[in-house]
Amino acid sequence: MDLEARVKKMGLGHEQGFGAPCLKCKEKCEGFELHFWRKICRNCKCGQEEHDVLLSNEEDRKVGKLFEDTKYTTLIAKLKSDGIPMYKRNVMILTNPVAAKKNISINTVTYEWAPPVHNQALARQYMQMLPKEKQPVAGSEGAQYRKKQLAKQLPAHDQDPSKCHELTPREVKEMEQFVKKYKNEALGVGDVKLPQEMDTQGPNRIYIPGGDRSTAAAVGAMEDKSAEQKGTQYSCYCCKLSMKEGDPAVYAERAGYDKLWHPACFVCSACSELLVDMIYFWKNGKLYCGRHYCDSEKPRCAGCDELIFSNEYTQAENQNWHLKHFCCFDCDNILAGEIYVMVNDKPVCKPCYVKNHAVVCQGCHNAIDPEVQRVTYNNFSWHASTECFLCSCCSKCLIGQKFMPVEGMVFCSVECKKMMS
């Protein structure tokens, strides 16, 4: 791809969702404007998933690319126009007759995603076993939850070098090898089946004693298959509780079909969120979402949210950073060798801290420098100096002394408090 085409593609990416309102900040945000490399809105600092952006096509392209060159190509279709793989997510529409007095109306429910099984009754049962707030019914809280989890669990920049910020050719090659490896070794999609249909063997199949099997009648007779199934219990690999007879279970091929999960238990072992569209990554006996699987393999930059493929990076505040991305969260100035303050786990340079975040002294009403000592009581602060931390009545210095706080004022004695009341 030539330079002009790459710049055009980057521009189109930054136009995606431009101006969309923030669902979290409401009117405080002027509208979505993607930061050049942070994956957040420049105006309100929230992620794109927090904004009312129509991303269905973009998300289908992302998941389609994830399944490309894997055994899950049946879940994608390539567009004739540009050959880009698109995720063929299964949309389920249910029509339920609803009696209203004498008239009968039709209530239609559309699920933006449903497990790709031929038995719609099984898919319906699966959905009913999910928490209501996580059922992806179109226009509901559950649909919004699915949208957020697609963005959070399967970041496009964890699989597509073109979605990353200025990777070197060596980093691009290393990332492509990493993606190929996890597609071959970890990526999977859950299957929804009835446990009784599976010839399951292993620790999740528990036989209940059904009498003395050593009798002559038992030794010579053929066992009735249905009776055997009734004498079998299946336990969830996550919660260890038994499955109810007739309830669907989720299987993960990479884990082996001796393991099964309740639909609501098929979650990431790191974040405990429902694995979106049952897309999982299997490692060391645990299920992961895409994000946390990658986190277990590579350091992630706390600035741009991308995986780090460079040999050189920095660590600060128990987080990892590209050298070029260890910047002030407010002004983007590089912080190497500079004084900074952590604000909500984000580094902020000293000038921006004083301007935007510093607490104000109740004595002099000026911002308190982060390197200066201060006295704090409840939500009020003072410079720890003889000029500021004084009795609000007689101006006696209160450093090291007992004091009486009253609505932002401090007094050295009951008498001074009474004089000001």
Swiss-Prot record:
Q: So which domain of life are we looking at? A: Eukaryota
Keywords annotated in UniProt: Cell junction, Cytoplasm, LIM domain, Metal-binding, Repeat, Zinc
Q: Name one GO molecular function term.
A: zinc ion binding
Every copy of the LIM zinc-binding domain together lies at 234-297, 299-359, 362-421
Q: Write down the SMART domains for this protein, in alphabetical order.
A: LIM
Q: What does the entry list under GO cellular component? A: cytoplasm; focal adhesion
Question: Where, per UniProt, does this protein localize?
Answer: Cytoplasm; Cell junction, Focal adhesion
One annotated GO biological process: negative regulation of cell population proliferation
Task: Describe the location of the PET domain by residue ranges.
Answer: 92-199
Record keywords: Zinc included?
yes
What this protein is reported to do is described as: Scaffold protein that may play a role in cell adhesion, cell spreading and in the reorganization of the actin cytoskeleton. Plays a role in the regulation of cell proliferation. May act as a tumor suppressor.
Family membership noted in the UniProt record: Belongs to the prickle / espinas / testin family.
What the entry says about domains is: The N-terminal and the C-terminal halves of the protein can associate with each other, thereby hindering interactions with ZYX.
- Record text on subunit structure and interactions: Interacts via LIM domain 1 with ZYX. Interacts (via LIM domain 3) with ENAH and VASP. Interacts with ALKBH4, talin, actin, alpha-actinin, GRIP1 and PXN. Interacts (via LIM domain 2) with ACTL7A (via N-terminus). Heterodimer with ACTL7A; the heterodimer interacts with ENAH to form a heterotrimer.
Quote the protein name from its UniProt record. Testin
